[in-house]
Curated annotation (Swiss-Prot):
Name of the protein in question: Beta-toxin ChFII.7
PROSITE patterns reported in the protein's UniProt record: LCN_CSAB (PS51863)
SMART domains cross-referenced by the UniProt entry: Knot1
InterPro entries: LCN-type_CS_alpha_beta_dom (IPR044062), Scorpion_toxin-like (IPR003614), Scorpion_toxin-like_sf (IPR036574), Scorpion_toxinL (IPR018218), Scorpion_toxinL/defensin (IPR002061)
Swiss-Prot/TrEMBL domain comment: Has the structural arrangement of an alpha-helix connected to antiparallel beta-sheets by disulfide bonds (CS-alpha/beta).
CDD domains xrefs: neurotoxins_LC_scorpion
The keyword Disulfide bond belongs to this UniProt entry's keyword annotation: yes
Keyword tags: Amidation, Disulfide bond, Ion channel impairing toxin, Neurotoxin, Secreted, Toxin, Voltage-gated sodium channel impairing toxin
Asparagine amide: residues carrying this PTM: N66
Taxonomic source organism: Centruroides hirsutipalpus (Scorpion)
Presence of the UniProt keyword Nucleotide-binding in the record: no
């Protein structure tokens, strides 16, 4: 599974500005989803890869980004 990293309290994606390989996105994806996750910046949001199937990614149901 893969998808955008989401802030559970706001419902917003984690923003990034350096597209492609991005240390910030990689670190944040691994912190939230574990060491096996990958991450890079895609369309100005942190995109996480190699996630477990139950991983929660953006968009959150019933929670819009404010």
């Amino acid at each position: 599974k893969e998808g955008y990293l989401v802030n559970h309290s706001t419902g917003c994606k984690y923003e990034c500005f350096k597209l492609g390989d991005n240390d910030y996105c990689l670190r944040e994806c691994r912190q939230q989803y574990g060491k096996g996750a990958g991450g890079y910046c895609y369309a100005f949001g942190c995109w996480c890869t190699h996630l477990y199937e139950q991983a929660v990614v953006w968009p959150l149901p019933k929670k819009t980004c404010n």
